[in-house]
Amino acid sequence: MSINEVRYLPECGSTNAYVKEHFEEFGPVGAVYTENQTAGRGRLGRSWVNAEGKALYYTAAIREPLAQPATLPLLASLAVRTQLKLRYGVDCQIKWPNDLLLNGKKIVGILCEGVSYG
């Protein structure tokens, strides 16, 4: 599965909300990212505090049916942790089901949401 389109937004309320609003515009797999997210949110409706210019906010849109969608947050956590270790030598820990910690501090939060379309 390869990414068909990546969109950069200088500022965005929420990358997840943007993808949900523009979902039909993406091909099978698309992505959007920003360095300034002004209305981020986490699981259970919690807010996600923005660190403008010091973080990357990224959402992937997958239009392909997933055999086991409930495993996506776990797989995403493992994939991001693996890439941080391989590419940057960052050895972080997974706080199941959706956070990555470095020295006890959260450095990644993963939020997976479904969208009905078609």
Each language-model region and where it sits:
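Glycine- and Gly-Pro-enriched alpha-helical subdomains that act as flexible
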Residues: I94-W96, L101-L102, L111
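Short secondary-structure boundary/hinge segments and terminal tails
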Residues: L102-N103, G118
